[in-house]
Structure formats: C-alpha cells, structure tokens
C-alpha cells in the first residue's frame, strides 16, 4: 500500500503532527477506498477523535496518540488474520501484523513462478580503486529461518503464539 502524505490547506494551522479532522477524513476517503465498507465510518470516528484532541488542548502528545490509534485501527482492518468481532490489544495487533508479513514473505519465497526465474544480473563493477569491495551480506531470510524460536522464551508463552 502506498504511503499517503496529505497537504495542509493554507488556512488555520493545526498542531504539529496532527492532520486536522476534515483533512484526515478527505485523505482517507481519497486513498482508503480499499479498506472495505466501514472505511467511511472509521474515518469519521478518526476525524472526530482528532477534533476532540485539538479542542481539548494543542498538545502534540494528544495528536500523536490520536495518530497512533488511527494507525492501529488501519492495521486491524488491513490484516486478514485479526478476528473482526473480537477485542484485541495493540500487542496482539502487532503480533498478527508480524505473522502476516512472515506469511507473505514465505509465500513469495516459495512461489513457483519466482523459483523458475533466473537470478537478476549482477550490478556493474566499479572501476579499480574507486570503491572498496564489501563482502556479500547474508539475506535476512537466512537469518530469520525460525522466528518463533528467537522470540519465544520461557516467560513469554502468554504474549507469543
């Protein structure tokens, strides 16, 4: 999904870090059409929370909290493994996001069409002495072969699946 950076209208300046109610609603309406049927209701609720935070005080911390809560709401809608009618904590949302990303990575690595393709051509070599040659890096996929083993510890059985 493409990141969206709204442009602030030239009128009243909102507190730093906060996009303003109407702007957030318009931005979500323009770019969030793939979020499903409840996107308009969620955008209206997010705009109302932002307006309430702006009206209460012009503190950047309130706007930041508003923005973070909106991000968690968006993650909850975008990740299909999160149960839609169950209350989940922010930690559980992040765990579902991590699991979903790992599932997508595995699907990409094992996709038959990608396995049959020849490797991409090597980048052009630098002229002698212009740039030192660094040793090749180990891909992250090789380092993260068993993410459950690296995360699960004796006392973490409640937090990690």
UniProtKB/Swiss-Prot annotation:
Family matches, as InterPro entries: bHLH_dom (IPR011598), DNA-bd_prot-inh (IPR026052), HLH_DNA-bd_sf (IPR036638)
Entry annotated with the keyword Disulfide bond: no
One of the GO BP terms on file: prostate gland morphogenesis
Expression induction or repression: Expressed in a circadian manner in the suprachiasmatic nucleus (SCN) of the brain with peak levels between CT16 and CT20.
Coiled coil, from the record: none
Record keyword Transmembrane helix present: no
Location(s), subcellular: Nucleus
Disruption phenotype: Mice do not exhibit a noticeable circadian phenotype.
GO molecular-function term, one example from the UniProt record: RNA polymerase II-specific DNA-binding transcription factor binding
Domain bHLH: 52-104
CC terms in the record's Gene Ontology section: cytoplasm; nucleoplasm; nucleus
Domain of life: Eukaryota
Keywords, in A-Z order: Nucleus, Repressor, Transcription, Transcription regulation
Subunit structure: Heterodimer with other HLH proteins.
PANTHER family: DNA-BINDING PROTEIN INHIBITOR, DNA-BINDING PROTEIN INHIBITOR ID-4
Function: Transcriptional regulator (lacking a basic DNA binding domain) which negatively regulates the basic helix-loop-helix (bHLH) transcription factors by forming heterodimers and inhibiting their DNA binding and transcriptional activity. Implicated in regulating a variety of cellular processes, including cellular growth, senescence, differentiation, apoptosis, angiogenesis, and neoplastic transformation.
Protein name: DNA-binding protein inhibitor ID-4
Gene for this chain: Id4
């Amino acid at each position: 999904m493409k990141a969206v950076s709204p442009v602030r209208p030239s009128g009243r300046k909102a507190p730093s870090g906060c996009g303003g109610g109407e702007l957030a609603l318009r931005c979500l309406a323009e770019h969030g059409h793939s979020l499903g049927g409840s996107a308009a209701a969620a955008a209206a609720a997010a705009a109302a929370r932002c307006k309430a935070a702006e009206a209460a005080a012009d503190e950047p911390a309130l706007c930041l909290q508003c923005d973070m809560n909106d991000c968690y709401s968006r993650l909850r809608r975008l990740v299909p493994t999160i149960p839609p009618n169950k209350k989940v904590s922010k930690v559980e949302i992040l765990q579902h996001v991590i699991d979903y990303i790992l599932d997508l990575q595995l699907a990409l690595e094992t996709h038959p069409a990608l396995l049959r393709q020849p490797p991409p051509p090597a980048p052009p070599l630098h002229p002698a002495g212009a740039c030192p040659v660094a040793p090749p890096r180990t891909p992250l996929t090789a380092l993260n072969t068993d993410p459950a083993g690296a995360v699960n510890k004796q006392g973490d059985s409640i937090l990690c699946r």
